[in-house]
């Protein structure tokens, strides 16, 4: 067992040898043996072993293993010192192994130790990004769940801090191909993180890159399968995937496949969908997603059939006027509930797809059904005007902080909803129906006009040509509820309340593929 004096003596021999350091193998072996000593010897060994490591390839395995022993020492200060120096072993063929080891060390619950591991990983990333990624993905695919989770989060948060020259096209391609392997079996939270990782890749900022991401989401969403409305996991999966897809669509990257699936598979069973969480109005979430996607729908094979499905669903949410009693009044308990939030989504989607078949209401819908629709439309429009007046009156004279109260914020959103519906209904009242108006969906931010002297942005304000957005996951907004005097509003209006939860309900391993839990231990 080497003593402190022997360690210093051996260090002196190696330091003084300069170009001939490789000839003093026995001195380096003494330093390696220092890991068997006490705390002082171990601390010195943790510093000395990496310093001369590159000069003794024959002892590389024993030197690295000795350093790893120190990384697992009971003394936290020794562990930290050993981890801090690990990146010095990342040369040549050793780099992927060191990356693998550092990835496993991410499971540390000591914050200082965890930060050292992160810094070491970033440091070897700059030496060899692809080799480092090999170690990370090895653990993501095969490691313990805690290691997998932290490795994914490392990629999602730290890669954006790397110098641009580190992430070459070859590295981007490697990340994409390895990520596709991981995505065969992920939880909902992992899927969202991987979309964040992939969306940040320079290679995928192009139209073809976005299309690749859309295809990836399509596979995850299971658009080739029939949706089981009774399975909350299946519904949850669809919602999460669609929320990741929406920011990717543009005039060049179409949502046709997704809109078709919603019209054919989801709308007919909308009322039977099982919500993945009590706080989620799953029908409204689905309709909002459909509305957002409809702006980017390309040529559709079964356009008339899908417009019919959308039209039928719209009719469900647009009630007929109540029958009048003998004195000409309407019984209060018979007055239909006007569900404005749902109707905004359905009308917007119908308006978008109707542009592609402008004679649908004239030539494709029979006379009786069209007459019924116009009666419903007129009744809805009358109720709409009442609420618009009430809302404007309630908000009249209010500005600044007064509009920031929760109640008034909800009323502002409600006014957006009713104004949108009003514009769309006016288009449909035209003879023939018009599809020229543009509105911004009530839960989408309105692009402000740039101040004079400021550089004008390239973003559009119309929902039919929405602003270009970075390819990132959706922001989480709080649900806003508006209860007008007569209680005819949908119970929920405003922004998406859907939360990205980790995993899914039920005992299905990782939720999307049943990885299951393994306890592998460290596999240095």
From Swiss-Prot:
Region (Disordered): 440-524
Residue runs in coiled coils: none
Protein origin, superkingdom: Eukaryota
Primary localization class, coarse: nucleus
SUPFAM superfamilies recorded: ARM repeat (SSF48371)
GO cellular component, one term: nucleus
GO molecular function terms attached to this record: RNA binding
Record Pfam families: API5
InterPro entries according to UniProt: API5 (IPR008383), ARM-like (IPR011989), ARM-type_fold (IPR016024)
Biased composition (Gly residues): 503-516
Record motif Nuclear localization signal, residues: 455-476
Stretches for region ARM-like and Heat-like helical repeats: 1-360
Family statement drawn from the similarity comment of this UniProt entry: Belongs to the API5 family.
PANTHER family for this protein: APOPTOSIS INHIBITOR 5, APOPTOSIS INHIBITOR 5-RELATED
Summary of subunit composition and partner proteins: Monomer.
Main function: May be an antiapoptotic factor.
Protein name as annotated: Apoptosis inhibitor 5-A
Species of origin: Xenopus laevis (African clawed frog)
